[in-house]
Amino acid sequence: MDNNDTYLHLSSSLQVAHGHLSSPPSQPPLSSMVSHHHPSIINGLGSPYSVITSSSLGSPSASMPTTSNMGYGALNSPQMNSLNSVSSSEDIKPPPGLAGLGSYPCGSPGSLSKHICAICGDRSSGKHYGVYSCEGCKGFFKRTIRKDLTYTCRDNKDCQIDKRQRNRCQYCRYQKCLAMGMKREAVQEERQRGRERSDNEVDSSSSFNEEMPVEKILDAELAVEPKTEAYMESSMSNSTNDPVTNICQAADKQLFTLVEWAKRIPHFSDLPLDDQVILLRAGWNELLIASFSHRSVTVKDGILLATGLHVHRSSAHSAGVGSIFDRVLTELVSKMRDMQMDKTELGCLRAIVLFNPDAKGLSNPSEVEALREKVYASLEGYTKHNYPDQPGRFAKLLLRLPALRSIGLKCLEHLFFFKLIGDTPIDTFLMEMLEAPHQIT
């Protein structure tokens, strides 16, 4: 397929996706082009996934054409609630008793290790609102109180709340926060102290967030997040034991949802269509890698594909891609897990990758650079607002970008090798991306 066909295919995807932005579609927006792509929203990662067993494949050695680095600008300039608030007809009040509380440790410092979160058992970052807790539970409790959110339990109001399942039921998580001793008034007092600050201390990033709202970026992430269970039946029946093939098939599916995601990022659709195509061509590999890395934070020694398949580290090593696979686990997945990167932060990092002013052929690189700067500013303001006790969090997030870029280029090298030897089936859209000229200067 020549480059004109590639351009028409991608630009057509952009135009079709543009008509499906008001809400997550019940039918695949690109069904007229590819009937087997299904963007939707994930319901949880706790259910068992099929595990790809190891197979053998020659180790890649070919190099792709030289491609210079994609810069991310100066590292000088958030985290939103990654959980959807669920309205409820019930008022949330401190319960007279919570099922299963007998097994919970007491919330007092004398009986609970200062290093353990009293709510979920994760690593504690200190005493928050009267209880030793992790940043995740601290932020969840604060958002619940400040936004006066109410939740509903879909089971029997006795859901297990631990490190792996704390996001499953917001109702039971909040009830446990109260039961362990978190104080609503502590959040309210903290907010009052913030209001008493001088008018001169108004966050200078607020105007940037209005131009590049992190809420919209989070919406984009949630709108195209795959329902892994929707793929399970087809994945189980059609899966091979070759992890490289399965990764390529998952990437091909996600390339279509990537178009829809980009159209939801503020101001992307305002760019000329040619520039939209160029930006997606330039960053698709890093955008997909960032997504599946974050999706895999709950997986041990493996990655979770959008198709619901779990690729284990041992399978990747047997297939000859162990080195790059280990880099994904140590430089991306592990780091995201350790800092508890949320969906809004992930979305902002992906938006920074998307708005790449160095992509070759842009009609107005300065306009793209200005959009990237707005994402920087919104992300910085977000982290300051949501993590005031982590002043280095913004810089820590940006430090994932060079690793993502390096890993993205190495993955391209592997894909070019597999395309060259022809042993791995590479589907339509992914093949087009590989055949398109590189857009990085």
Swiss-Prot record:
<comment type="similarity">
    <text>Belongs to the nuclear hormone receptor family. NR2 subfamily.</text>
</comment>
<dbReference type="InterPro" id="IPR000003">
    <property type="entry name" value="Retinoid-X_rcpt/HNF4"/>
</dbReference>
<dbReference type="InterPro" id="IPR021780">
    <property type="entry name" value="Nuc_recep-AF1"/>
</dbReference>
<dbReference type="GO" id="GO:0007399">
    <property type="term" value="P:nervous system development"/>
</dbReference>
<feature type="region of interest" description="Disordered">
    <location>
        <begin position="56"/>
        <end position="94"/>
    </location>
</feature>
<keyword id="KW-0862">Zinc</keyword>
<keyword id="KW-0863">Zinc-finger</keyword>
<dbReference type="GO" id="GO:0048384">
    <property type="term" value="P:retinoic acid receptor signaling pathway"/>
</dbReference>
<dbReference type="InterPro" id="IPR001723">
    <property type="entry name" value="Nuclear_hrmn_rcpt"/>
</dbReference>
<keyword id="KW-0805">Transcription regulation</keyword>
<keyword id="KW-0238">DNA-binding</keyword>
<dbReference type="GO" id="GO:0003700">
    <property type="term" value="F:DNA-binding transcription factor activity"/>
</dbReference>
<dbReference type="InterPro" id="IPR035500">
    <property type="entry name" value="NHR-like_dom_sf"/>
</dbReference>
<dbReference type="Pfam" id="PF11825">
    <property type="entry name" value="Nuc_recep-AF1"/>
</dbReference>
<dbReference type="Pfam" id="PF00104">
    <property type="entry name" value="Hormone_recep"/>
</dbReference>
<keyword id="KW-0539">Nucleus</keyword>
<dbReference type="GO" id="GO:0030154">
    <property type="term" value="P:cell differentiation"/>
</dbReference>
<feature type="DNA-binding region" description="Nuclear receptor">
    <location>
        <begin position="117"/>
        <end position="182"/>
    </location>
</feature>
<dbReference type="GO" id="GO:0004879">
    <property type="term" value="F:nuclear receptor activity"/>
</dbReference>
<dbReference type="GO" id="GO:0003707">
    <property type="term" value="F:nuclear steroid receptor activity"/>
</dbReference>
<keyword id="KW-0010">Activator</keyword>
<dbReference type="GO" id="GO:0008270">
    <property type="term" value="F:zinc ion binding"/>
</dbReference>
<keyword id="KW-0804">Transcription</keyword>
<feature type="region of interest" description="Disordered">
    <location>
        <begin position="188"/>
        <end position="210"/>
    </location>
</feature>
<dbReference type="GO" id="GO:0044323">
    <property type="term" value="F:retinoic acid-responsive element binding"/>
</dbReference>
<dbReference type="GO" id="GO:0045893">
    <property type="term" value="P:positive regulation of DNA-templated transcription"/>
</dbReference>
<feature type="zinc finger region" description="NR C4-type">
    <location>
        <begin position="117"/>
        <end position="137"/>
    </location>
</feature>
<feature type="compositionally biased region" description="Polar residues">
    <location>
        <begin position="64"/>
        <end position="89"/>
    </location>
</feature>
<feature type="domain" description="NR LBD">
    <location>
        <begin position="209"/>
        <end position="437"/>
    </location>
</feature>
<comment type="function">
    <text>Receptor for retinoic acid. Retinoic acid receptors bind as heterodimers to their target response elements in response to their ligands, all-trans or 9-cis retinoic acid, and regulate gene expression in various biological processes. The rar/rxr heterodimers bind to the retinoic acid response elements (RARE) composed of tandem 5'-AGGTCA-3' sites known as DR1-DR5. The high affinity ligand for rxrs is 9-cis retinoic acid.</text>
</comment>
<feature type="region of interest" description="Modulating">
    <location>
        <begin position="1"/>
        <end position="116"/>
    </location>
</feature>
<feature type="zinc finger region" description="NR C4-type">
    <location>
        <begin position="153"/>
        <end position="177"/>
    </location>
</feature>
<protein>
    <recommendedName>
        <fullName>Retinoic acid receptor RXR-gamma-A</fullName>
    </recommendedName>
</protein>
<dbReference type="InterPro" id="IPR013088">
    <property type="entry name" value="Znf_NHR/GATA"/>
</dbReference>
<feature type="compositionally biased region" description="Basic and acidic residues">
    <location>
        <begin position="188"/>
        <end position="200"/>
    </location>
</feature>
<keyword id="KW-0675">Receptor</keyword>
<keyword id="KW-0479">Metal-binding</keyword>
<feature type="region of interest" description="Hinge">
    <location>
        <begin position="183"/>
        <end position="206"/>
    </location>
</feature>
<dbReference type="InterPro" id="IPR050274">
    <property type="entry name" value="Nuclear_hormone_rcpt_NR2"/>
</dbReference>
<feature type="compositionally biased region" description="Low complexity">
    <location>
        <begin position="21"/>
        <end position="32"/>
    </location>
</feature>
<comment type="subunit">
    <text>Homodimer. Heterodimer; with a rar molecule. Binds DNA preferentially as a rar/rxr heterodimer. Heterodimerizes with rarga.</text>
</comment>
<dbReference type="GO" id="GO:0090575">
    <property type="term" value="C:RNA polymerase II transcription regulator complex"/>
</dbReference>
